[in-house]
Swiss-Prot record:
GO terms for molecular function: ATP binding; hydrolase activity; identical protein binding; profilin binding; protein kinase binding; structural constituent of cytoskeleton; structural constituent of postsynaptic actin cytoskeleton; ubiquitin protein ligase binding. It is linked to Deafness, autosomal dominant, 20: A form of non-syndromic sensorineural hearing loss. Sensorineural deafness results from damage to the neural receptors of the inner ear, the nerve pathways to the brain, or the area of the brain that receives sound information. The gene is ACTG1. It catalyses: ATP + H2O = ADP + phosphate + H(+). Belongs to the actin family. The modification Tele-methylhistidine is found at H73. The keyword S-adenosyl-L-methionine does not apply. InterPro entries: Actin, Actin/actin-like_CS, Actin_CS, ATPase_NBD. Actins are highly conserved proteins that are involved in various types of cell motility and are ubiquitously expressed in all eukaryotic cells. May play a role in the repair of noise-induced stereocilia gaps thereby maintains hearing sensitivity following loud noise damage. Changing E316K: In DFNA20; uncertain significance. One of its GO terms (cellular component) is nucleus. This is Actin, cytoplasmic 2.
Length: 375
């Protein structure tokens, strides 16, 4: 009668939440990590208006809501809203009873310890899960690419990090984190579109700009040359129709926006670009393993989906590395979901089953158990 109970895999990103069942090859539910609350007083009685909306429903009613993201830079900043998102994931998206399934959650490396303790506490105390585990996002991406050695450059909506992994072990001293990711690029695009005379200010309008970014932006192989091309001809211009039917045209903004990944000074940040961060991460590793990292540089996360990003990374890292070094940038087509896919693989391995933190262990040790059991 022993029926295999599938584990749930939830990759809570700053921008999108990916959820589904271990063993599946793609997440069942992908929805924005947003909680929306009405901006105005309801006047029509019996409309069944709610005091909060989550995910796609919040997105579709965004014109009358104030949208908030409870996860900023990979760290949960509003636990009440986070609980709403998890509740929505279990009961509305996956339609499961959380008390019947082990749950695998993900988090960004170098997150505050309190963050994963609180995640653990909510899973066991609010949702009564039988078991749970918290995995590092980048490690899962490497699993998904079928490797045990490599450096993962994972860039999502809230945080970018480079994680060197050797024979399955993440090398914590060489992990670097950059708080520059998709949301900052969206904000930057809002700013440079304003310079063109289009005004985007509200939280709802930010979502429109995010869509423009996802559909039209790309990474230039040579930024200066691309700027010259854009100035001398209109070949790079594209138009976009806003929800109200107005059509806007964007030109050099298409590649100026993601260029900030390579030149954070565009955003007034003093950090290194993603290419230098990746290189610095490799240089913090033992000299003997660098060759393997250069040859296995894996891109993951939604912010690596820009056309041209892999070629540009190849060019930039080749310029930084020793001249004889073989450099290979791996950009799997499913990299938007590779963290989730890696989680699905991990949670369905027979060898992983002893790794879960059980409710019993939690009851004996409290939330701090998560630091001992999860890497």
């Amino acid at each position: 009668m022993e029926e295999e109970i599938a584990a749930l895999v939830i990759d809570n990103g700053s921008g999108m939440c990916k959820a589904g069942f271990a063993g599946d090859d793609a997440p069942r539910a992908v929805f924005p990590s947003i909680v929306g609350r009405p901006r105005h007083q309801g006047v029509m009685v019996g409309m069944g208006q709610k005091d909060s909306y989550v995910g796609d429903e919040a997105q579709s009613k965004r014109g009358i809501l104030t949208l908030k993201y409870p996860i900023e830079h990979g760290i949960v900043t509003n636990w009440d809203d986070m609980e709403k998102i998890w509740h929505h994931t279990f009961y509305n998206e996956l339609r499961v009873a959380p008390e019947e399934h082990p749950v695998l959650l993900t988090e960004a490396p170098l997150n505050p310890k309190a963050n994963r303790e609180k995640m653990t506490q909510i899973m066991f105390e609010t949702f009564n899960t039988p078991a749970m585990y918290v995995a590092i996002q980048a490690v899962l991406s490497l699993y998904a690419s079928g490797r045990t050695t490599g450096i993962v450059m994972d860039s999502g909506d809230g945080v970018t990090h480079t994680v060197p992994i050797y024979e399955g072990y993440a090398l914590p001293h060489a992990i670097l984190r950059l708080d520059l990711a998709g949301r900052d690029l969206t904000d930057y695009l809002m700013k440079i579109l304003t310079e063109r005379g289009y005004s985007f200010t509200t939280t709802a309008e930010r979502e429109i700009v995010r869509d423009i970014k996802e559909k039209l932006c790309y990474v230039a192989l040579d930024f200066e040359q691309e700027m010259a091309t854009a100035a001398s001809s209109s070949s790079l211009e594209k138009s976009y129709e806003l929800p109200d039917g107005q059509v806007i045209t964007i030109g050099n903004e298409r590649f100026r926006c993601p260029e900030a990944l390579f030149q954070p000074s565009f955003l007034g940040m003093e950090s290194c670009g993603i290419h230098e961060t990746t290189f610095n991460s490799i240089m913090k590793c033992d000299v003997d393993i660098r060759k393997d990292l250069y040859a296995n540089t894996v891109l993951s996360g939604g912010t690596t989906m820009y056309p041209g990003i892999a070629d540009r990374m190849q060019k930039e890292i080749t310029a930084l590395a020793p001249s004889t070094m073989k450099i290979k940038i791996i950009a799997p087509p499913e990299r938007k979901y590779s963290v989730w896919i890696g989680g699905s693989i991990l949670a369905s391995l027979s060898t992983f089953q002893q790794m879960w933190i059980s409710k019993q262990e939690y009851d004996e040790s409290g939330p701090s158990i998560v630091h001992r059991k999860c890497f």
